[in-house]
């Protein structure tokens, strides 16, 4: 890990007063690594409130969050074996980030995260169509930071480069999730109810300058989806359903700290096309969704596409 925030502190100390230099946190590098791991943990944790392939754009105040995720899970055999995978890209841009590193000075950081997470679990039936699914997860990712400190580029005073001082961090995560869900039919309505608790612990890979930095992703997800057949609407001559969904993600610990919010809620609508008549192997339906996003510090939207197997 290149000492992103430590470089920032050094640059500021070289260009401002000795009093300001004394306010620099000497553990800035470890703090930067923990911040980077916290941001990466959000991207690497599967979010069931969004579609399998989704684009999210949210902003508020001095923060912006953009992410793309490709997520899916299925049972390859007739038994309870369940496999899950996620590939995600996220860009998070807060201002006044970890202000204790340089007291009274704004730090504008753009964190770009790429993550891949896999999961292996087993599905057990409960009662009344409810099922429980414990899953073990392994994740790999990289987060890169570009920063602007006190309205000027993070550039050493004697450097001939015109690039921002930036840095990257490779990390791995390991953890587990427990999901409880139900799929049922109520009259013409098909409904899904899902509860999921996910915990992943992230640590840097071969980054001695990161010190003892680590971060955890601890998220609780509540989600529901309702489908209603549109008998008089056919797209591409295929049966169509109206889809309504809503969910909330509750963030705990490091995830809540780095996002500065304890929750993120979504609600949306869309159309689902029955694809069983097309001959596509294993695919039962395709779904297009538009969701609104709201949180304490954010608001925005998400566009997603999903498949039902």
Q: Which residues does each predicted region cover?
A:
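Residue-level detector of the transmembrane beta-barrel scaffold of outer-membrane proteins
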Residues: 41-43, 80-86, 131-135, 190-194, ...
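Residue-level signature of outer-membrane beta-barrel architecture
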Residues: 72-76, 120-124, 178-186, 226-230, ...
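Bacterial N-terminal signal peptides
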Residues: 6-15
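Bacterial N-terminal signal peptides that target proteins for export
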Residues: 1-5
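Outer membrane beta-barrel transmembrane domains
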Residues: 208-309
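Generic detector of solvent-exposed, compositionally biased contiguous segments
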Residues: 49-69, 110-112, 260-274
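Outer-membrane pore/translocation modules
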Residues: 23-26, 77-223, 248-252, 256-264
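Short glycine/proline- and aromatic-enriched beta-strand/turn motifs that initiate or cap beta-hairpins
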Residues: 20-102
